[in-house]
Amino acid sequence: MYVSTVEKKCLIVKLTEKVEDLSFINTLFSENCHHLILNLQEIELTNATLLSKFTTFGKKLVGTNSFVMVSTQFINKEWNIVPTLKEAFDIIELEDIERQLNF
């Protein structure tokens, strides 16, 4: 179903099968985690509605911190979907800088 790790104050959840309910991530997110990366590379994305639902969940969970999805099938800057994990960390770093500068 999923694999999770914490790296650089980011909870990284890699889905290994398609799910619609991400509420299980609430139990994985801790005070050691400021940001959430949802890795969707191993699942087939078939509709934008599901991605919109994931975005709403992720942004609500992290509050003012960063939420990024990783997928090579559906890249969308508006929803912070990038093709690699490295780019996800880059987005988080840029957003941290913007927050520090009050952008």
Over which residues does each language-model region extend?
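Amphipathic, Lys/Arg-enriched alpha-helical "gate/interface" segment within cytosolic domains
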Residues: 2-6, 12-103
